[in-house]
Amino acid sequence: MAEKRNIFLVGPMGAGKSTIGRYLAQQLHMEFLDSDTVIEERTGADISWVFDVEGEEGFRKREEAVINDLTLEQGIVLATGGGSVKSRENRNRLSARGIVVYLETTIEKQLARTNRDKKRPLLQTDNPREVLESLAGERNPLYEEIADYTVRTDDQSAKVVANQIVKMLEES
């Protein structure tokens, strides 16, 4: 991989996008960015607050603006929010402006990785499994639609997955 193309990580919450993204950026000597973190920095509030005050629609508008800005950067690894693919504009920008890696995982792994995380507004419910299954049905086809590569993250450490991605990129 001679030139440093942007790498965009997509996938459901709990797939490991942020953790894997940090390792990947380190290995490739690239900058790591997380769209949710940038939204929080720009609003001065956490994602839960944005959801509470502006609703999901307000959050998605902010997310769209952030993804537009960040995908114009050069040489970055970007961890996107799980729902970012709901926007056609986001899907188009991610596809056109870099390499999209879909981090795939099971509902069981998502539940295990997110069960104590209070910063996930969509999971603040009595039945998170039902929510995750519904989100998977809606979003998994969208991740697949834009993915240049797909990597399962279930039973591997973040470092191992990052190494796999580096290898895939070197071979292409």
UniProtKB/Swiss-Prot annotation:
The family this protein is said to belong to: Belongs to the shikimate kinase family.
Amino acids binding ATP: G14, A15, G16, K17, S18, T19, R120, Q156
Enzyme class: transferase
Subunit structure: Monomer.
Keywords: Amino-acid biosynthesis, Aromatic amino acid biosynthesis, ATP-binding, Cytoplasm, Kinase, Magnesium, Metal-binding, Nucleotide-binding, Transferase
Catalysed conversion reaction: shikimate + ATP = 3-phosphoshikimate + ADP + H(+)
Membrane spanning residue stretches: none
Residues noted as binding Mg(2+) in the record, renumbered to the chain: S18
Residues the record lists as binding substrate: D36, R60, G82, R139
PANTHER family: SHIKIMATE KINASE (PTHR21087), SHIKIMATE KINASE 1, CHLOROPLASTIC (PTHR21087:SF16)
Tagged with keyword Nucleotidyltransferase: no
Cofactor binding notes: Binds 1 Mg(2+) ion per subunit.
Gene Ontology CC terms, in alphabetical order: cytosol
Organism (species): Vibrio vulnificus (strain YJ016)
Protein's name in the database: Shikimate kinase
Pathway: Metabolic intermediate biosynthesis; chorismate biosynthesis; chorismate from D-erythrose 4-phosphate and phosphoenolpyruvate: step 5/7
GO molecular-function terms, A-Z: ATP binding; magnesium ion binding; shikimate kinase activity
Described purpose of this protein according to its UniProt entry: Catalyzes the specific phosphorylation of the 3-hydroxyl group of shikimic acid using ATP as a cosubstrate.
GO term, biological process aspect, one: amino acid biosynthetic process
One Pfam family it belongs to: SKI
Intracellular or extracellular location(s): Cytoplasm
E.C. number(s) listed in UniProt: 2.7.1.71
Cofactor annotation: Mg(2+)
